[in-house]
Each structure stands twice: as C-alpha cells, then as structure tokens.
Amino acid sequence: MEQIVEWLTLSKHTVVLTGAGMSTESGLADFRSKSGWWQQIDPRTVATTEALTSNYALFQQFYAARIQALEDVKPHDGHFILTNWQRRGLIQHIATQNVDGLHTLAGSDNVDELHGSIRSVRCQKCGQAAEMQHFLAKEACPCGGKLRPNVVLFGENLPQGAWNHTLSHMKAAQLVIVIGTSLEVYPVSQLPHMTNGKTVYINLESGQSHFDLTIEGKAGETLKIIDALLKRDTI
C-alpha cells in the first residue's frame, strides 16, 4: 500500500480504469464471477446485435431487469474517494467499463464510459434519443424502430470519442490504476499496455502478472485504506 501512495503522490498524470468489481460494493452483480450475470445468462443470447434484431423480447427483458436493478443503487465510498482525488489533482482521468453511471453520480467529471451507459435510451433505427419509460413499457419509437439502452453490445464498436480520449490519457500517464476488472474484454484489455508509466492492479482475484504492483482486495475497501494513508502523509 505504501508503494501506491508514493506513486500517486509523485505522479503528474494518473489514469484510473474501473470494471464491474468497482460496482459490486454498491450491490450490483458483476459479470464473470460465479454469481455474475454471465453465469446465469449466455451473453451471446441477449447482449448482442443479433438478439436486438431477432429476439427483441428477450433483449428487452434482460436490459429492463438490469435498469430496474439500478433503482436503489448508490455510489459507495470508493467512488467518492476517486472523485475527491480527481478534485485534488491526484488523478487526471477516469475511464470505466461499467455502464451504471455511478462514477458520475459520485461527482466525477468527464468520465469516459467505454461500454456506454444503461441510463439512457435511443432508437436502433433512427438514432433518436428516447425516454426510459418507453423502453421499459416495451414501446417502439415513433419511426417504428426498436428502443435500446446506449450500451455497447457484443459485435459493436466502442464509442470512438471516449476510446480516443482514454487512449491519449493512457499514453501520457505516469501512473495507471486498474480497479475491479478481469481485463478479459478486448479492446479495453489492451489499455494498460499503452502506457510507459507505472501500473497498479486492484482486484479480488489477482490473475495479472504484467503490472508493477498487484493488490488483492475489494475496490472500495482498498481505496479507503489508500486514502487513509494519503491523509496521514499530508498531515
């Protein structure tokens, strides 16, 4: 822990990349653990452009359940710690694979949501923004198109603006902190390789050998320990 505190204090450009493990402490299921979404449902049957086109009833049911699961979910201490670090100038950029919007709800600025956001909806046919209640009510767009959340489905490209913005920060980073992701999904899995800076991996399961420092633990709990050490050193 002392090592990351030193690096975080000395770094002039720090980037944080988060995954599903960042959200589990807020009560959301992750995807790849034994109790995660993908153990219950084959992603190839629901989170794809094919499902949107040919099995819309299942697609809508799956995403409606995920949207409704967010109703009482709030950011945890770890989200607020990252916001505080950002405001103090300790970190310069936050990117996330999560679609839940919890970083933004915690007050973080200019978060790049690399896999989109489940908190907004659009028409697949005309691209027009739509109201969430219309999607939940299984309504179609006035043009006749199918409504869908603004998430990146399997088979779709990442939002180019968010990707390019994060990539530029990665290349400039002196320190990259990866939190709560197994780094199994391409191309986000490649981002930590794009930096010449120090790299830190925080996750319940280690599984990553190419990082300069690996810390096994829950995201929020680990961030609270690091934050306490930072505060101790600044007293």
What are these regions (language model features)?
Residues 1-235:
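Conserved catalytic core of sirtuin-type NAD+-dependent deacylases
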